[in-house]
Amino acid sequence: MLIPRRVKHRKQHHPKRSGMSKGGTQVAFGEYGIQALTPAYVTNRQIESARIAMTRHIKRGGKVWINIYPDRPLTKKPAETRMGSGKGSPEWWIANVKPGRVMFELSYPNEKIAREALTRAAHKLPMKCRIVRREAGES
């Protein structure tokens, strides 16, 4: 699973989910990609689950790129704890995904199998997604 090796601060503020993605909105490496349509926090477990769903469907002959990284900690207080007495301990690592961001890319010779693999991966993610294809003019 994806987690940072070292962090400067163990606990951070929650990232803002408003606005559109500033970069990473086009397919850059593969032929097809999964693009976010709504904002969400994507955990490292969800990223890994989507990656496994894709790679198991395409078996061999394809390549997968993951364009998001869970570098923000989310904290949680224990159950049945009264309010106050500090912030909770880090529970998850999340990637803050904004609309328009291409999260996963896939290169595979058969378009039908590639689209099915990306659809399976999109079902594992906590937001609305669409499958995008590299434009003819893009390098």
From Swiss-Prot:
Task: Please name the SUPFAM superfamilies in this protein's record.
Answer: Ribosomal protein L16p/L10e
GO MF term list: rRNA binding; structural constituent of ribosome; tRNA binding
Bias (Basic residues): 1-19
The record's region (Disordered) falls at: 1-25
Q: Which GO terms describe its cellular component?
A: cytosolic large ribosomal subunit
Q: What are the entry keywords?
A: Ribonucleoprotein, Ribosomal protein, RNA-binding, rRNA-binding, tRNA-binding
A Pfam family this chain is assigned to: Ribosomal_L16
Spell out the InterPro entries in the cross-references.
Ribosomal_uL16, Ribosomal_uL16_bact-type, Ribosomal_uL16_CS, Ribosomal_uL16_dom, Ribosomal_uL16_sf
Question: Which biological process terms from the Gene Ontology are attached to this UniProt entry?
Answer: translation
Which family does this protein fall into?
Answer: Belongs to the universal ribosomal protein uL16 family.
- Sum up the protein's function in the record's words: Binds 23S rRNA and is also seen to make contacts with the A and possibly P site tRNAs.
Summary of subunit composition and partner proteins:
Part of the 50S ribosomal subunit.
HAMAP family the UniProt entry points to: Ribosomal_uL16 (MF_01342)
Record-given protein name: Large ribosomal subunit protein uL16
Which species is listed as the source?
Streptomyces griseus subsp. griseus (strain JCM 4626 / CBS 651.72 / NBRC 13350 / KCC S-0626 / ISP 5235)
